Amino acid sequence: MVDYEREEEHTTPEQPKRSKKGYFLSSLIGVIVGAVLMAFIMPYLSNEGLDTGALDQQQNNNGRESIRTVNVSVNNAVTKIVSNMSPAVVGVVNIQKSDIWGESGEAGSGSGVIYKKNDHSAYVVTNHHVIEGASQIEISLKDGSRVSADLVGSDQLMDLAVLRVKSDKIKAVADFGNSDKVKSGEPVIAIGNPLGLEFAGSVTQGVISGTERAIPVDSNGDGQPDWNAEVLQTDAAINPGNSGGALLNMDGKVIGINSMKIAESAVEGIGLSIPSKLVIPVIEDLERYGKVKRPFLGIEMKSLSDIASYHWDETLKLPKNVTNGAVVMGVDAFSPAGKAGLKELDVITEFDGYKVNDIVDLRKRLYQKKVGDRVKVKFYRGGKEKSVDIKLSSADQLGS
């Protein structure tokens, strides 16, 4: 029997042909989707600088790129303050005779602040060290012009001086603010002429780093601090030419007169400014008297800590428990101290109820009093404690 194998025909179903209309719809949908996606992502590409289409649109008909001008407003509180106050901050030029022939030249320059004006005169406050030794002083105004200035008075202890100029060219006057209200962290602006008049009207900004800082000052040049200057500390850049310039609060008020800069190689510079509460009474005295009228004792002093310890017992005869005080090294017989009976080698340990640690302490308490005040002074003489009442006077009353 013969078996026949049956071949099965396997056929693939014929696919229906797409019409031209189908192709068109697919293409149209793809174009729409692509357009939507591009519209969505183009702003992001533009922000990243990849919007080539935008670049093409900035080209003119000659294929060159055009430049757009963008106006940005930069007016803020600082720029307004600077605009208003810059004309009130001036340059101060110290002119000295430089040789035996009497020729004069600029010995240095600093800054100053115009704080008062009347029909005839305007007054400028600056630092004593800026005008020290000057045979002639000039003021450089904001427009670059110079006017001659007269020295009204100066005070070495506070490092302040007052100048007077004719008022016809003065356009702006600064107002003082209350430095007692200044807080650490408060923003401030410094205006001055760092490193000379080439950088006139320079502006720096910072904050108050600290208030009531005490900086030792050697007022008589003997190499020993005899006074602590109370200053504001700021991180606003203050360079040597800034001396006498203004430290402003955000109300545009002068809260300090820039005076010193402490700079060390390992730290940032520290800007220091004399607070307005101390500036105002000094310049008022300088205007009125040409000097500051302070109460004085009429003695030369040295801190006990600066005296060799073996003298404490052998020469001064001090008890073992007395380790601080101010030693009287000399007395004017007609001074308040001389009239009260203080003598050389007396050791002052208490002034007006306050302990005296050294001569800095004593001067601090003394300058807080007024001419005419009476104070009680305790001291040691020959190992015994004594006390006297002293009526304070000013130096110009000596002998009266």
Swiss-Prot record:
Gene3D superfamilies: 2.30.42.10, Trypsin-like serine proteases
EC number in record: 3.4.21.-
Residue intervals passing through the bilayer: 22-42
Membrane topology recorded in Swiss-Prot or TrEMBL: Single-pass membrane protein
UniProt-annotated catalytic positions: H129 (charge relay system), D159 (charge relay system), S243 (charge relay system)
GO BP terms in the entry: proteolysis
Name of the protein in its database record: Uncharacterized serine protease YyxA
Organism: Bacillus subtilis (strain 168)
